């Protein structure tokens, strides 16, 4: 868990500002809701919090440290973003998809370590997917597919 804070955060695409001058403090362990109409910038804002998009202006802090100065591995251990629409047309097994959550921790040739495999197995168990781990995502129900994407975020 971590404290997450923004100060005058402005985020967008190219020169188009989508979210402007947002200051928010999310204390450790606090659950918040982000609501608004379609196209209002909710996903864009979350992408900035997860360091997927860089701020146009302002700052994002994780535990009082500027997010841009923190190593990717450390950010990934504290923040994961699960998209509202995840592509399940890929021909991968559940275990393979969950293993992508370990990407920020891989070095060199990108081989998984014993610690990675442990995190993957834990995430599969936590989402009740262990018995389905070697099945193709195509064979799952909608709810099971959602659990796969949640497991990937947990493995991260």
What is each residue range found by the language model?
Residues 99, 114-132:
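Conserved ABC ATPase "signature" region
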């Amino acid at each position: 868990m971590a404290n997450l804070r923004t100060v005058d955060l402005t985020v967008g695409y190219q020169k188009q500002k989508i979210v402007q001058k947002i200051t928010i403090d999310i204390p450790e362990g606090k659950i918040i809701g982000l609501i608004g109409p379609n196209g209002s910038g909710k996903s864009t804002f979350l992408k900035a919090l997860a360091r997927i998009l860089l701020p146009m202006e302002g700052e994002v802090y994780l535990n009082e440290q500027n997010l841009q100065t923190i190593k990717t591995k450390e950010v990934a251990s504290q923040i994961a973003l699960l998209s509202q629409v995840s592509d399940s047309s890929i021909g991968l097994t559940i275990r393979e998809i969950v293993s992508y959550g370990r990407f920020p921790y891989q070095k060199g040739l990108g081989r998984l370590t014993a610690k990675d495999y442990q995190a993957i197995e834990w995430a599969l168990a936590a989402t009740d997917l262990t018995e389905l781990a070697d099945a193709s995502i195509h064979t799952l129900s909608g709810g099971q597919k959602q659990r796969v994407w949640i497991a990937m975020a947990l493995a991260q």
